[in-house]
Amino acid sequence: TLASGQLSLGAAGFMSVGAYVGAILSLKADLPIVVGIIIGGLVASLVAVIIGLPTTRLKGLYLAIATLGFGEVVRVIFLNLDITNGALGLSGIPSIPQELTNYAYEFDLDGLMGIDAVAWGNLMAIIILLAILVLIIACCVRINNSRVGRAFAAIKADDHAAELMGINVVYYKMMAFIIGAFIAGIGGGLYAHITNFI
């Protein structure tokens, strides 16, 4: 969102949405980890649409305060829901490193090159996380070098001038807000499935 000149402090709220949705889908609905994480990112994006409609018209400190308030509201909601186990949190979330360790045992990688299966699982988890990071960076670079990125830069420089040039400021601010929420939701889902507890 900062690419379009918006200071949003709601990333923790969107990360929470992604983490809880991904964890609940993996725990309660027995969905694969990847599916739960992606759905968590999509739900965070949907929440961004709902929150973004009124808040993207705000600027500066007012937007920062509104999005910070959203993060606190999300925290209080998740601490008081039965499905999230309240203040006790969710434990036993399927772990990405553990799943990869199971695959290492299944494919008989235990002891290969002097590395045990647990280390293989952790190594593969790190490689997957780095690949996701590279993919997100590549997407952000691609967006910045596109027509959308130029619109973001124009809005960041002067949103009134950008609007006079025919750029739909609210549309592009919403787009930046939704993209940021999706990335935060994916990050939250990954966090939940790495730490096994939220």
What spans do the regions from the language model cover?
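Transmembrane alpha-helices and adjacent helix-loop boundaries
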Residues: 1-198
